[in-house]
């Protein structure tokens, strides 16, 4: 199968190539696409070199599938053009996520919503994906009423420039800044732009996407998202109120049996999820599982995942695998 990766030279695009290879996705020919400044560069995939081309030429090459990770403006302009040419697009930007005509998919939760007619499929926000993968089995059993999430997010979510800024600051080297402030030895309580309601766009992504993925507009969600000087993955402190009471042992059992979830929760041995351990893993790690002592039917969780993998590239490839396995691609 011919597969295009739009944004192939970025952090997520590079990870998409890695994940496609690792999971043995049937790529007969890779079509790497990037911006003007990357045209003519070569990327290596499965031992072969491929030249980076522009989006127009990629459409002419007639791939069956295009994985997009080149930002919202690129997706808004080019995804419909790819789709019009009969190419299935899985888009990692926020461009199509809340479009009522587009599916927002986390395969462990709502892959059954997909159909052969879906030409543009949205990949959710990284911080949303890991949270809903962990919470969905609990929602099925106890019905979530309210979620309060605080995130501790990796600089890799911003991109190459942010990683470079962090590494430069650690070495005491001056360079281009991805953030308005230093990130090393710091925590920046702003991810994306502030909106009129006082929340950031990232925070509202978590609010709105959670409801759409879990197909339940009654769930109340509030979030505070924070960038921290970490590279391995995103961490989240999540407080969840349910309609029904629960037993902690049953919660652990449900999470242990959930697809894509690994429970790491042994406080006595100082065992809990950390971004360093989640790095280059596809699972969502859950720990610090405990009842909220201040409110009935309420649980605290600590959720960690590699935002470039399950939070982006792996989730997109899993969507493609589902389409392929069900004769939709």
Where are these regions (language model features)?
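N-terminal Rossmann-like NAD(P) cofactor-binding subdomain of oxidoreductases
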Residues: 1-183, 218-220, 284-285, 289-295, ...
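Charged docking surfaces used in two-component/phosphorelay signaling
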Residues: 66, 155-329
């Amino acid at each position: 199968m011919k597969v295009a990766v739009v944004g192939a030279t970025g952090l997520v695009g590079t990870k998409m190539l890695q994940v496609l290879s690792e999971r043995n996705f049937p790529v007969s020919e890779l079509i790497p696409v990037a911006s003007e400044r990357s045209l003519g560069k070569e990327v290596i995939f499965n031992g072969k070199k491929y030249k980076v081309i522009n989006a127009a030429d990629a459409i002419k090459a007639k791939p069956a599938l295009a994985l997009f990770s080149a930002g919202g403006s690129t997706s808004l302009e080019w995804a419909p053009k790819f789709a019009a040419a009969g190419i299935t697009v899985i888009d990692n930007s926020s461009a199509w996520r809340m479009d009522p005509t587009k599916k927002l998919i986390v395969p462990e939760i709502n892959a059954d919503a997909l159909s052969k007619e879906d030409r543009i499929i949205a990949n959710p926000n990284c911080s949303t994906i890991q949270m809903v993968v962990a919470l969905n089995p609990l929602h099925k059993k106890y019905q979530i009423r309210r979620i309060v999430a605080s995130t501790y997010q990796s600089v890799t979510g911003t991109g190459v420039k942010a990683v470079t800024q962090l590494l430069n600051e650690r070495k005491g080297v001056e360079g281009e800044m991805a953030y308005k402030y230093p990130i090393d030895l710091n925590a920046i309580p702003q991810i994306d732009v502030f909106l009129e309601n006082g929340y950031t766009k990232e925070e509202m992504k978590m609010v709105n996407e959670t409801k759409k993925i879990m197909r339940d507009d009654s769930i109340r969600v509030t979030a505070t998202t924070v960038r921290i000087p970490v590279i391995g993955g995103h961490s989240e402190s999540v407080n969840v109120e349910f309609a029904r009471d629960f037993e902690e042992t049953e919660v652990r059992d449900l999470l242990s049996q959930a697809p894509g979830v690994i429970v790491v929760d042994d406080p006595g041995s100082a065992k809990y999820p950390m971004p360093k351990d989640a790095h280059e893993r596809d699972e969502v790690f859950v720990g610090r599982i405990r009842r909220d002592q201040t409110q009935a039917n309420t649980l605290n969780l600590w959720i960690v995942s590699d935002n470039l993998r399950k939070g982006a590239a792996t989730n997109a490839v899993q969507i493609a695998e589902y389409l392929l396995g069900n004769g939709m691609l």
